[in-house]
Amino acid sequence: MKSFIVGLVSAVAVSSVLARDNIQIAGSSTVLPFASIVAEEFGNSFSQFKTPIVGSGGSSGGIRQFCQGTGANTIDIANSSRKIKDKELKACAEKGVKNVIEVKIGYDGIVFASRRDSNKFELTTDHIAAAAKGNAKTWNEIDPKLPKQEIMLIIPASNHGTREVFEHKALGCKKECPLRQDGRIIEIAGDYTETLSKLNIDKNAVGVFGLSFYDSNRDKLQVATVNGVTPSAKTIETGEYPISRPLYFYIKGEHVGVIPGIKEYAQFFLSDMTSGNGSPLDKAGLVPLNDSERKEQLAKLK
């Protein structure tokens, strides 16, 4: 009798997953525009599958949703601008998500941008750390070579993977990262469009963005150099630009073969025509994987 009940519960769980026939994705605001392009192209190219639904919510928020369990009411893929943490994998496993497939999709840089009618900045990581953690009121108090301009930093909130990379690579924080609390830092829980609106309001504001978002808004923004390097696809690819990071999505292995099209979507995303040199994602600002990296990631999906 006990084995019958266990089998019945398993059958109900599987059938509830089968009740949904479209891929559901959430997570990183940085990955969002890339995933949206791929989802639309995937829907157009594969008539047998429905167009995936892509949402945002930040890397941490997406992974949190991803780890809520398996079934039709949970997402299939989490986009992330950082690697998943061990504690998140543990949380996933506790909810039955034990087969987490990590897929690296390319690279992006974190840039510091301001309005085009504002001062130009030539920053170092030390300048950025002093502005975020110190008590200077103007940039030239940190370094006389910097503009005499009020410090106002618009940064991603803690639900974004960009925030963690910013703290680690720009501010030099290893674990805890106490920031100034005097109103000169504004944290944005929403996406980059919200950061952009803050810059539109305040000429002094310097915003933290992904390179791809800046590339899409060059008519409105100017970008700072960091350690003497201008952020670009080339300087990120070569490693010259100091604040860059790989981008990922995470697949719920338990849903592969149950929710239609997950494997095909991932392979389509990683295909050279979708995310390689000269591809739609390359043109949208994603720095492509090299050939060996692409081959390695595709091997995970066989």
Place the predicted regions along the sequence by residue.
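Exported/periplasmic ABC-transporter solute-binding proteins
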Residues: 19-302
